[in-house]
Amino acid sequence: MAYYWIAAAVVILDQWTKWLVVRYMQLGESIPIIDNVLYITSHRNRGAAWGMLEGQFWLFYLITVIVVAAIVIYIRRLKPSERLAGVGLGLMLGGAIGNFLDRVFRKEVVDFIHAYIGTYSFPVFNVADSALTVGVILLFVHMFFFATPEKGNE
């Protein structure tokens, strides 16, 4: 149950921060947080990561519903000792739902976190994207370092 609370917290934080950006910033406006490193930039994305597959809403709806269902099934099958995987899945669930809500209600995803790594301008992203990324990393860490292989029928 705690993993669903993590997902809910991600969705609330994601939607609140997006609302703030839409409400108080002009599209394209950028506010420096740390010069040459981190900015809040009002941006919209009608595709997937980095603008891929722009305008393919039904594909995104279908994929998201399948992913959310798979995450919920996986969470239900977790053992109590698999907390790291559960946290990762909770983050992934919240991130998937956060961006799904944007696609359904706005027909675009609000992005606003703009980071620079040296001279490289990283694509603008949001809280949901961050949660998805961290969730995937945690799931991989769990799988590679903590998961025990299932014993087959011998």
Curated annotation (Swiss-Prot):
- Keywords in alphabetical order, please: Aspartyl protease, Cell membrane, Hydrolase, Membrane, Protease, Transmembrane, Transmembrane helix
GO cellular-component terms in the record?
plasma membrane
What membrane topology does this protein have?
Multi-pass membrane protein
What InterPro entries does this protein's entry cite?
Peptidase_A8 (IPR001872)
Q: What is this protein called?
A: Lipoprotein signal peptidase
Q: Which gene encodes it?
A: lspA
User: Which PANTHER family does this one have?
Assistant: LIPOPROTEIN SIGNAL PEPTIDASE
The principal localisation class reads membrane
Gene Ontology MF, one: aspartic-type endopeptidase activity
Entry's localization field = Cell membrane
Concerning HAMAP family, the annotation shows: LspA (MF_00161)
Report the pathway entry: Protein modification; lipoprotein biosynthesis (signal peptide cleavage)
- Which terms does the UniProt entry file under GO BP? proteolysis
Biological function: This protein specifically catalyzes the removal of signal peptides from prolipoproteins.
Active site per UniProt: 111, 129
Q: Which family does it belong to?
A: Belongs to the peptidase A8 family.
The EC number(s) this enzyme carries: 3.4.23.36
- Name the residues that span the membrane: 55-75, 85-105, 127-147
